[in-house]
Swiss-Prot record:
The gene is BORCS8. Belongs to the BORCS8 family. Keywords: Disease variant, Intellectual disability, Lysosome, Membrane, Neurodegeneration, Phosphoprotein. The modification Phosphoserine is found at S109. This is BLOC-1-related complex subunit 8. InterPro entries: BORCS8. One of its GO terms (biological process) is regulation of endosome size. It is found in: Lysosome membrane. It comes from Homo sapiens. Changing S42P: In NDOABA; uncertain significance; decreased function in lysosome localization to peripheral cytoplasm; contrary to the wild type, the mutant does not rescue defects in lysosomal distribution in BORCS8-deficient cells; reduced interaction with BORCS5 and BORCS7. Pfam families: BORCS8 (PF10167). Component of the BLOC-one-related complex (BORC) which is composed of BLOC1S1, BLOC1S2, BORCS5, BORCS6, BORCS7, BORCS8, KXD1 and SNAPIN. PANTHER family: BLOC-1-RELATED COMPLEX SUBUNIT 8, MEF2B PROTEIN.
C-alpha cells in the first residue's frame, strides 16, 4: 500500500511545483521585466525611425515651399505680360522717334513719326 500513496504524494508535489513555476513565469513583475526588455531593444530603432520621418517631413515642406514659390513667380510673369507688351510698344515708339530725330539732324526729311500710342 505504500506505493500508491507515494505516487499520490509525488503527483501532488509535481502539481504544486508546476503551479508554482507557472505562477512565477506569469507574475506581473516578470511580465513588466519582459516588457522593459522589449522596450529597451525596440526604442532605439523607433527613435531612429521618428528622426528619419521628421527629417523627411522638413525636406518635404521645403520642397513644397519651393514649388509654391516657383508657381507664384510663373503666375506673376504671366500676369505681367500686359506690362511687357506696353513696354515693347513704348520702346518701338522711342526707336522710331530716335530714327526720325537722326534723320532730321542729317538734313533729310523723313516721313512723319507715328503718333504716340495710348498703351
Amino acid at each position: 500500500m505504500e506505493e500508491p500513496e507515494m505516487q499520490l504524494k509525488g503527483k501532488k508535489v509535481t502539481d504544486k511545483f508546476t503551479e508554482s513555476v507557472y505562477v512565477l513565469a506569469n507574475e506581473p513583475s516578470v511580465a513588466l521585466y519582459r516588457l522593459q526588455e522589449h522596450v529597451r531593444r525596440s526604442l532605439p530603432e523607433l527613435a531612429q525611425h521618428k528622426a528619419d520621418m521628421q527629417r523627411w517631413e522638413e525636406q518635404s515642406q521645403g520642397a513644397i515651399y519651393t514649388v509654391e514659390y516657383a508657381c507664384s513667380a510663373v503666375k506673376n510673369l504671366v500676369d505681367s505680360s500686359v506690362y511687357f507688351r506696353s513696354v515693347e510698344g513704348l520702346l518701338k515708339q522711342a526707336i522710331s522717334i530716335r530714327d526720325h530725330m537722326n534723320a532730321s539732324a542729317q538734313g533729310h526729311s523723313p516721313e512723319e513719326p507715328p503718333p504716340p500710342s495710348s498703351a
